[in-house]
Each structure stands twice: as C-alpha cells, then as structure tokens.
C-alpha cells in the first residue's frame, strides 16, 4: 500500500519480485542495488532461508522525478521461490503496490513458472486483490540459454492479463532496469489516478508538479467606478456694509 509522508514530502511504494525458485529474482535486485548511486539506495538486507533468500532495500530513482512535489521511494522485495515458503511469500506480498513476475525461459521450467504464477494469484486473492487491478510486469529471464522458449510462446502461455513483457539476462544486467522502470511508472500512474497527484517534468505523467494540477490564478476584480463629481454650490455673496451713522446735530 502506498504510504505518503507529507512531513518528509515523500511517497513510499512497495514493489515485489515474484517467481519460481532460481528464476532470477534475487539477481535482479542485486543488479539494481549494485548499479544504483549510493545516495539513492538503502542497505541491501538479506533474510536467509534454506536454499533461498528474501532480499529488500529502498531505492529512489532519479529519472522518475517527483510526484505532486514529493520524492518517490520504492521498497524492492523478493520472495522465496520454493513452494514450502508460501507463508513467507504471503507476508512479503502484503501491501505490495506492483509485481514483477520473473519467469525462467527454459521449457523444462514452464510448469514451475505456471505453478508460481497461480500461487501469486491465490495469495493476492486472499488479500482481496487481483492481478487485473494491480500493476504487473512479466520478465522472460535467461534469454541467453540455447533452449529458451520464444517470447511469443511464453506470452501465449502466461500473459493472460496482457501485461508488459521484457526479455532479460539478469546475470549480465540486460533487461533489469527497463523492467523495474516500467513497473515503477505503472505504479505512479495508478497513484495519480487514485490520489490526484501529478508528476513533474520527469515523472510518469509529465504533468504539473503541484497536487491536483496547476490552477490558473483568479482574474483580478475590475476597479470600482470613480465617484460622481460633487454638485457645485452657488457662490456666497457678502452682504452690503451697514450705512454710516448720521452726523451729530
């Protein structure tokens, strides 16, 4: 769930990387954290479980600018891929504002991809959410492998929500940042619609940076009409002087 800190002028969004075990979720986050400027990222935290890890850190991308005059911060999370860590996946998924589903492009991994995708739908359903209303990006990872399925075939089998898709080789960084940037833009666009916040010139919407859009200044009231001229008073005539007194006898 989006958190808006008006005191810090900051918007916090949670993005979750979902997918089967060893599909490349952890690699995606490690690449982003390694290449992001030190001033724009928090500490990479890892919670180790047997055979898998949950990673998370804060990331403030420069290229997305501000929304409603506020900085945007994204909290990036991965979930453990193994089926027996479903309780952890549910916990990490709570409050998510968008999801990157990382699929393994190898044909022998298709069943695991579909099982994990169905699990994502079920866990969101328990929270009263669906992927049709949540920002979703699909990443076809491991495109460098010789047996990788064609993107069209992956799309036909997995993309029933018509989500944006990206090809990737996460170990080399290829496709990692375009995937993240697209999801971040989708989340901010949804935020604009729900909260009426509009982004600056570098934001997802490219609209005015003030909340609710720029307002035109009110037109100045016309000046009051001048007062009517005062009526002229007739000039006063001084009375004639009194006659002189008569001479004495």
Labelled PLM ranges:
Residues 1-49:
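Conserved G1/Walker A P-loop phosphate-binding module
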Residues 8, 52-55, 65-70, 90-95, ...:
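Conserved catalytic network of the ASCE P-loop NTPase/AAA+ motor domain
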Residues 22-23, 81-83, 106-108, 142-146, ...:
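Conserved nucleotide-binding/hydrolysis micro-motifs of P-loop NTPases
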Residues 43-84:
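Switch I (G2) and immediately adjacent beta-strands of P-loop GTPase domains
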Residues 85-108, 124-125:
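Inter-motif core of Ras-like GTPase G domains
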Residues 108-130:
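Amphipathic helical hotspot of TIR/SEFIR-family domains
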Residues 137, 143-197:
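Canonical P-loop GTPase G-domain recognition
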């Amino acid at each position: 769930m989006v958190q808006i800190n008006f005191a810090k002028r900051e918007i916090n969004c949670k993005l979750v990387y979902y997918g089967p075990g060893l599909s490349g979720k952890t690699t995606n986050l490690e690449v982003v954290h390694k290449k992001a400027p030190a001033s724009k990222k928090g500490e990479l935290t890892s919670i180790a479980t047997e055979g898998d890890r949950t990673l998370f850190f804060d990331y403030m991308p420069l290229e997305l600018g501000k929304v409603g005059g506020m900085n945007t911060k994204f909290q990036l999370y991965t979930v453990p891929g193994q089926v027996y860590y479903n309780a952890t996946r549910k916990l990490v998924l709570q409050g998510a504002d968008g999801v990157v589903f990382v699929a393994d492009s190898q044909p022998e991994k298709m069943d695991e991809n579909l099982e994990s995708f169905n699990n994502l739908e079920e866990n969101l359903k328990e929270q009263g959410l669906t992927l049709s209303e949540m920002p979703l990006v699909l990443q076809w990872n491991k495109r460098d492998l010789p047996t990788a399925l064609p993107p069209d075939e992956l799309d036909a089998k997995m993309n029933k929500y018509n989500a944006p898709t990206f090809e990737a080789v996460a170990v080399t960084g290829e496709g990692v940042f375009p995937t993240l940037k697209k999801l971040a833009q989708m989340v901010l666009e949804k935020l604009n619609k729900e909260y009426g916040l509009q982004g600056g010139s570098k934001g997802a919407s490219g609209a005015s940076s003030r909340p609710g859009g720029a307002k035109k200044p009110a037109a100045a009231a016309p000046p009051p009409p001048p007062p009517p001229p005062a009526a002229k008073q007739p000039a006063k005539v001084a009375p004639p002087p009194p006659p002189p007194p008569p001479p004495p006898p």
